[in-house]
């Protein structure tokens, strides 16, 4: 079997992209494959021994995706390449990760790319991957994002490696509802001053063009291609594992999910499928735009006994100046309104509305930053204590 290596935290969550890729390789290209999630605290000697034994009688092709910037995984790929493996890098950021930053050759402080670790890079969804692509060193294959994606997932193909290989029982999955983010369609120009500790050195401000949020890889990698057909979303949900007669919790991948949530819950119920929990990763402005509808939505969720977890809301900062630097498209007043809405609704939907850290949420907050002067820190702290 081909091994597809990824980063993994060790928690019982699936990895949609990598697991869908392994499923595609097996079901469409007849290349048996599994995903091996490597935990941060692992035994390198044991891993190399496992890889050597696994590939003893088969073609030495190893794939990598979702590496989360881990240098130890880059080095693993480099070592395998030196040992005669064909190493393949896949995923939404494969192009930039493989090539490096623009003008990196003349600017040594820029990211130089991962050509020394990988023979082949495949950018984008797996649909257009062909067996020949795995045989041409130096190739960068780019697959466009469209709504016609391969979305079959064998949720049982994920294993973990720490000291040895062990199968992971996935208890949290992902379901794709939209490709990219509508905010990514918006171009912005951010005027950035020099970092706080360099302000007295005569360094001028600089302008940076951004698509969507200035730090967001989704904006550059995917842009926005709209919602998937509902039938394709339902097929993904129907394919999820079950626990105690209900589908396991899943993240609904959609930066603006609230518009779809009510109709989706109703459609799933009509198909005789019982849900347990839906996790949302969304923007502040989506919550504010639908604040008057959330009560009815949560009543519907409560009727079907489905918990709604706002797992990650992109606050990023509680200072207006920083929000403008990040091209967030929101203000501190917007954030306060969002939080007040959730606090008010929590009084009614105690068990079915979840958004606190002790309920599993982990909201976006970027700090420290190079611009954290006294004025900004005071504004952030004042907002936090509201």
Q: Where are each of the predicted segments found?
A:
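A short, flexible N-terminal coil/short beta segment enriched in small residues
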Residues: 1-29
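Conserved SAM/AdoMet-binding glycine-rich loop
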Residues: 1-6, 88, 226, 230-372
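Alpha-helix termini
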Residues: 29, 50-57, 104-113, 186-189, ...
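Residue-level recognition of beta-strand->loop/alpha-helix junctions
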Residues: 29, 35-40, 217-220, 365-367
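Glycine-rich beta-alpha loop elements in corrinoid/cobalamin-binding modules
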Residues: 32-147
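Flexible, low-complexity linker/hinge segments
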Residues: 155-170
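Canonical Radical SAM [4Fe-4S] cluster-binding loop centered on the CxxxCxxC motif
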Residues: 166-230
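Catalytic cores of alpha/beta
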Residues: 370-385
């Amino acid at each position: 079997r081909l091994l597809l290596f990824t980063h993994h935290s060790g928690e019982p969550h699936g990895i949609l992209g990598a697991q869908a890729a392994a499923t595609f390789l097996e079901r469409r290209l007849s290349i048996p494959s599994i995903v091996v999630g490597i935990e941060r605290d692992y035994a390198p000697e044991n891993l190399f021994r496992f890889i050597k034994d696994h590939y003893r009688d088969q073609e030495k092709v190893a794939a990598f995706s979702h590496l989360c910037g881990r240098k130890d995984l880059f080095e693993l790929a480099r070592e395998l390449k030196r040992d005669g493996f064909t190493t393949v890098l896949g995923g939404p950021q494969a192009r930039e990760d493989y090539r490096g930053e623009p003008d990196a050759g003349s600017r040594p402080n820029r990211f130089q790319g991962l050509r020394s670790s990988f023979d082949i890079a495949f950018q984008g969804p797996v649909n257009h991957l062909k067996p020949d692509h795995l045989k041409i060193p130096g190739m960068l294959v780019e697959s466009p994002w469209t709504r016609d994606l391969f979305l079959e997932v064998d949720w049982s193909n994920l294993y973990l490696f720490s000291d040895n290989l062990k199968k992971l029982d996935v208890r949290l999955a992902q379901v794709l509802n939209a490709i990219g983010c509508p905010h990514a369609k918006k171009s912005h120009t951010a005027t950035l001053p020099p970092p706080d500790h360099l302000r007295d050195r005569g360094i001028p401000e600089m302008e940076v063009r951004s698509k969507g949020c200035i730090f967001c890889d989704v904006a550059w990698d995917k842009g926005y291609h709209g919602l998937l057909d509902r039938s394709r979303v339902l097929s993904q949900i129907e394919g999820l594992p079950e626990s105690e007669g209900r589908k396991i919790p899943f993240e609904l991948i959609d930066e603006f999910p609230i518009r779809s949530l009510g109709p989706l819950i109703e459609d799933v119920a009509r198909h005789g499928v019982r849900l347990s929990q839906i996790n949302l990763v969304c923007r502040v402005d989506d919550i504010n735009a639908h604040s008057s509808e959330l009560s009815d939505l949560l009543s519907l969720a409560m009727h079907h006994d489905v918990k709604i977890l706002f797992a990650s809301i992109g606050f990023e900062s509680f200072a207006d100046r920083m929000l403008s630097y990040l091209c967030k498209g929101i203000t501190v007043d917007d954030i306060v309104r969002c939080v007040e809405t959730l606090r008010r609704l929590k009084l009614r939907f105690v068990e079915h509305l979840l958004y606190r850290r002790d309920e599993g949420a982990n909201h976006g907050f970027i700090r420290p930053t190079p611009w954290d002067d006294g004025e900004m820190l005071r504004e952030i702290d004042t907002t936090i204590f509201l």
